[in-house]
UniProtKB/Swiss-Prot annotation:
Keyword Transmembrane: no
GO biological process: vacuolar acidification
PANTHER family: V-TYPE PROTON ATPASE SUBUNIT B, V-TYPE PROTON ATPASE SUBUNIT B, BRAIN ISOFORM
Superkingdom of the source species: Eukaryota
NCBIfam families: PRK04196.1, V-ATPase_V1_B
GO cellular component: proton-transporting V-type ATPase, V1 domain
Organism from which the protein derives: Gallus gallus
Similarity section: Belongs to the ATPase alpha/beta chains family.
UniProt name for this protein: V-type proton ATPase subunit B
Summary of the function given for this chain in its UniProt record: Non-catalytic subunit of the V1 complex of vacuolar(H+)-ATPase (V-ATPase), a multisubunit enzyme composed of a peripheral complex (V1) that hydrolyzes ATP and a membrane integral complex (V0) that translocates protons. V-ATPase is responsible for acidifying and maintaining the pH of intracellular compartments and in some cell types, is targeted to the plasma membrane, where it is responsible for acidifying the extracellular environment. Essential for the proper assembly and activity of V-ATPase.
Length: 453
């Protein structure tokens, strides 16, 4: 946490040409000689050359306002869209306010993303924190953009979606991304008409490293203001958390701290928790913060410290798979390592449909067996497989082609997703569907997929 604490100690400096600079404390050494080492957060990487220094006597606060929606800021919170400065309604500490755990509300409203692999088998609740585990070259940005386009609340009546925009906002924070990624999200928000409800914070790859530590906290402070003061439902997209963790390692090394696993600081778990835990719902407030951090796993390694520690803190993960991507399946979401820990409370009768949990469990079981059969087929050949094995193979192919695969602008309701699931399960005789109760089978198994709800 030392690197983050350092980033909160600010000074205002004047450069040799009289230019004003803002800097954050990097190291403190009063034993050999009384000195503070600072690093600029508003200029290029490297030491800050200043001729005068003014201590602010305060921690780093950010101006917040509802007018920040529709605006683009740099990683330090300065407008970069040629618009006026923000007329602040308040100045808030970027580390946020501690929330009494007793005042947190358990997330129970499902967010419909329109993506079957998520809605059907890894449902997201409003107020949840669930990361996208991806890797270099995979379409994680496209998936996140599709979720932003299509996300809405499932109403308790049939086939009704809540797309109301007056109380919905998106806060997008980019850390260490290239210009192409920043342009992709900005143009996508503009094209689907949601830019007025989006606040962007962009720290590009050529921006200062220490700014990368501040950017997600600026975004989350803004999100907390919009959620708890303006009572909006806020979706926070953070990309790329791997760049953030590497910035943390760089600042930690500059401070000569004792390194931990793979050179990352020992407090990285605690530091990531200070970001991820700023999601959820609070008693007495109508707003919510749903977090979808995106991280790229180095060398596709899920045991790397960044995805490993993230998985401990967050409530599940959405796993983007390279093998599915290589087979031209979009979105390439592998449902087996994916998980949503809050799914059980967001689905079922009165929220989605009473068969939702049973269909999800049976699809998981059949897909897992299908994967085993596929591996066995590679060893013994198709001729050695039983008739049941061939059914699982057929299910495997149709599941990936019809259930997981869909278009980037295809928005399926949760009811359409469940109907596709039943179509696939009808490949098997009723006796083989052992994870679905007989009463549910009697009601849904014989039904024609075109039947009305």
């Amino acid at each position: 946490m030392a690197a983050v604490a350092a980033a909160r100690r600010m000074v205002n400096g004047a450069g040799p040409g009289g230019a004003r600079e803002q800097a954050a404390a990097l190291t403190r050494d009063f034993l050999s000689q009384p000195r503070l080492t600072y690093k600029t957060v508003s200029g290029v990487n490297g030491p800050l050359v200043i001729t005068s220094c003014e201590f602010t006597g305060d921690i780093l606060r950010t101006p917040v306002s509802e007018d920040m929606l529709g605006r683009v800021f740099n990683g330090s919170g300065k407008p970069i869209d040629r618009g006026p400065a923000v007329l602040a309604e308040d100045f808030l500490d970027i580390m946020g306010q501690p929330i009494n755990p007793q005042c947190r509300i358990y997330p129970e409203e499902m967010i419909q993303t329109g993506i079957s692999a998520i809605d059907g088998m890894n449902s997201i609740a409003r107020g949840q924190k669930i990361p996208i585990f991806s890797a270099a070259g995979l379409p994680h940005n496209e998936i996140a953009a599709q979720i932003c386009r299509q996300a809405g609340l499932v109403k308790k009546s049939k086939d009704v979606m809540d797309y109301s925009e007056e109380n919905f906002a998106i806060v997008f924070a980019a850390m260490g991304v290239n210009m192409e990624t920043a342009r992709f999200f900005k143009s996508d928000f503009e094209e689907n008409g949601s830019m007025d409800n989006v606040c962007l914070f962009l720290n590009l790859a050529n921006d200062p490293t220490i700014e990368r530590i501040i950017t997600p906290r600026l975004a989350l402070t803004t999100a907390e203001f919009l959620a708890y003061q303006c009572e909006k439902h806020v979706l926070v997209i953070l990309t790329d958390m791997s760049s953030y963790a590497e910035a943390l390692r760089e600042v930690s090394a500059a401070r000569e701290e004792v390194p931990g696993r793979r050179g990352f600081p020992g407090y990285m778990y605690t530091d990531l928790a200070t970001i991820y835990e700023r999601a959820g719902r609070v008693e007495g407030r109508n707003g919510s913060i749903t977090q979808i951090p995106i991280l790229t796993m180095p060398n596709d390694d899920i045991t790397h410290p960044i995805p490993d520690l993230t998985g401990y803190i967050t409530e599940g993960q959405i796993y983007v798979d390279r093998q599915l991507h290589n087979r031209q399946i979009y979105p390439p979401i592998n449902v087996l390592p994916s998980l949503s820990r809050l799914m059980k409370s967001a689905i079922g009768e009165g929220m989605t449909r009473k068969d939702h949990a049973d269909v999800s469990n049976q699809l998981y079981a059949c897909y897992a067996i299908g994967k085993d059969v596929q591996a066995m087929k590679a060893v013994v050949g198709e001729e050695a497989l039983t008739s049941d094995d061939l059914l699982y193979l057929e299910f495997l192919q149709k599941f990936e082609k019809n259930f997981i695969a869909q278009g980037p602008y295809e928005n399926r309701t949760v009811y359409e997703t469940l109907d596709i699931g039943w179509q696939l399960l009808r490949i098997f005789p009723k006796e083989m569907l052992k994870r679905i109760p007989q009463t549910t089978l009697a009601e849904f198994y014989p039904r024609d997929s075109t039947a009305k709800h």
